[in-house]
């Protein structure tokens, strides 16, 4: 709630900022800036505030798409890792390798693969500008993020699968339930608490995404893959620590709202009640 330091045109010295109220929040939310004449007007092009809502859209787009893909792929990987086999331990170790690799290394790896002369364009037979075309760059980041964090989802879902008693599946087999019926009426309801925890963790992590798009594509605030976290870092680099703190508060409120909605309406308690109902329906 404090103004940032600014240069006094009369003395040429930096002066301390005073109480700003909600000025910083209005700066980000409404793109309103103080003009040279002291009036408040629309921020000109190039000001960070003009990139706020585009970065919010990009962040939410990344979150929805990556979490959805990682959930579907994570369930499949967890089912494979939970299936009894001689190489189950080897499969589990191999699946977790992408998650164990540092994000910076992952970003550079995929950056090389998506280069104009990289392996991706060679396999596709087309010269796609993955790092400059807006939508191609976004999908490149999504692919890299899904490859990196799907094992995390699979690990949490696997923990839920291992909590399901084996005799439940035996009873379903005796009753003549098909594989699809077993999955939809037993596996999915009983694993839902762990699944919702995995989705919650990944959603919160995706909302604060920063290093992957910065290293792969660009750290600029007007990049097609710029997230909200990038604006915070860029604002701090310009010395605007108070407005950057206000933006960090807005990010916190966004993450808190998403977490509250997911816990309140899609929490483990709801999943547990639905799971018990599903178990009664299979008997």
State what each model feature region is.
Residues 1-283:
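A structural signal for multi-pass alpha-helical bundles of membrane permease subunits
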